[in-house]
């Protein structure tokens, strides 16, 4: 029931101010949070303001993904070392299913690696792409 209740705010400014990353991204700069918040707020049917995401996402159960073994292209998995969403074991399990998978752990980042340590993400992407035939 709690997941179906949406928190709304009287003004757009209130909603933007209350926007937070989930999971938290403590390394992300406040200016980035504010910029993303500006694009993540929408006006609801009742005229109040809420966040533009589907709350049903949080009720999707984890499941085995046997189709991963059929992915034949090189695949890069980026995992933030401090991620509370994707464990090291979970990332390795994904990588083990991908015939051409490569795992890179990003230090100084949780689940949202591209927000918390964009320089390390860029380096990992460049290295991955440079190694492609």
Identify what each model region corresponds to:
Residues 1-3:
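Short, contiguous pre-domain boundary segments
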Residues 6-67:
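Conserved alpha/beta-hydrolase catalytic His-Asp/Glu region
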Residues 7, 83, 110-113:
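Glycosyltransferase donor-binding loop in the core domain
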Residues 10, 86, 116:
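Residue-level signal for the nucleotide or nucleotide-sugar donor/cofactor binding architecture
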Residues 41-97, 102-105:
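Conserved serine/cysteine hydrolase catalytic core
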Residues 99-133:
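Catalytic active-site module of serine/aspartate enzymes centered on a nucleophile-bearing elbow/loop
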């Amino acid at each position: 029931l709690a997941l179906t209740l949406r928190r709304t705010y009287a003004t757009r400014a209130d909603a933007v101010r209350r926007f937070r990353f989930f999971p938290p991204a403590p390394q992300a700069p406040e200016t980035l949070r504010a910029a993303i918040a500006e694009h993540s707020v929408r006006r609801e049917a009742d005229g109040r303001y809420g966040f533009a995401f589907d709350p049903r996402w949080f009720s999707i159960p984890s499941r085995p993904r046997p189709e991963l073994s059929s992915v034949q292209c090189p695949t890069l998995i980026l995992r933030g070392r401090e991620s509370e969403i994707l464990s090291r074991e979970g990332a390795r399990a994904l990588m083990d299913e991908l015939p051409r998978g490569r795992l890179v752990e990003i230090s100084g980042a949780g689940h949202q690696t591209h927000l918390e340590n964009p320089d390390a993400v860029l380096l990992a992407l460049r290295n991955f792409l440079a190694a492609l035939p």
